[in-house]
């Protein structure tokens, strides 16, 4: 946990650096060279990892878009190529749009960054009344609330029926697992609350503001703020390796497209094309002003959004496998900030089922790169997210492809070992302590809602089924595993399975806890945060 004093020290250090750090160094103008280098590198990456279905890549150099291109196919085995107009889900890269929207409202005098959230959302409540009172609009964006990693994400993922109001109402039941403003833990639910602040101030939903005040002025005509608005636009299909034995291993598989992420739009709803996202990068690098002179926000707001707020990580610096590893990393307002080979880089990643994306901006060069993929291929993503900025700097001296292959091989070996360990019953696969019918019933968690366990079949064919009442995708068989621990087998095999550990007292089931089966499960499957009580 990072103490408040250390955070204050970090902000003080950045304040001392001040404008000098944001002033542009004198780099030689070489517009076009980085775009060509990234294009060549992307082709090398695609050749090195032939299972990667497709990519969309955009490069801005000295304020000009020099590359906006698609690579590969929209669907593995299909004929449709990825082009500069193909839409990808950019997930948490959306957070910078939400921060920019709030910055615009700050400039209009409709709110202040350090106003309490309750001023605009009177019903806003965290589980700690002190945190409720102190939580500001700025805090909503900084991942320093004290919530644990991904807390409450089952209210937004995968495709549940919770409304935005449900999500905000559920916050008061999420335990504060850390120190308020004293540490970093990434969340999504507070960005949903930030979107509701925008709606409360403007009288229109978050997506309407984003469309009218950002996408339309930038002429981002391909892009949509919510997946449900894609319609018949060309889009990439999501892919992942679904095992065996666990997700992340096995052959590449096409996943069903999730178009129902609307409730969490402010946290990750945007779908964008390579040619559109370059316009967003330009206005960011222009500190609120486009190359054509259209001003969306002031330079002061642009700098405010890039100002470090929360320490997120620190290390001993570069390693043999990662020569760009930063010694210190921070979160700003919708962006991460650290250095890349001695230059400030402002960046973010995004992940949805079957999609990974990355935005990296080098303000000193007024240059940046956006990488959008339609698969969960970590070595492809790692090669491009680090090798891309290298090429913006005119470098190609490190073999990111070889390094990423090595890191991936080591990761897969560990994953196989960890998965085998997770799937080995500690009690030797003992039978349940009670008849299966005793586990049936409705279980309720205060922030998520109800989970139903039911009996199917009769006699020797009796089995259990499980259904998350507000998440249609999370339903299927509940198989015996080890005593009172069962394992889900969801009908939708693109979902992460979970262990369900029932609590038994005096011969009766009283409740249950859960945890993901795969060691590589996305943190948004926050089963471990559920405290299910049988009702």
Language model segments and positions:
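Short, well-ordered beta-strand elements
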Residues: 347, 358-361, 365-374, 512-513
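Short loop/turn microsegments at loop-to-beta-strand junctions
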Residues: 53-55, 333, 356-358, 499
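Peripheral terminal and inter-domain segments
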Residues: 312, 321, 343, 383-535
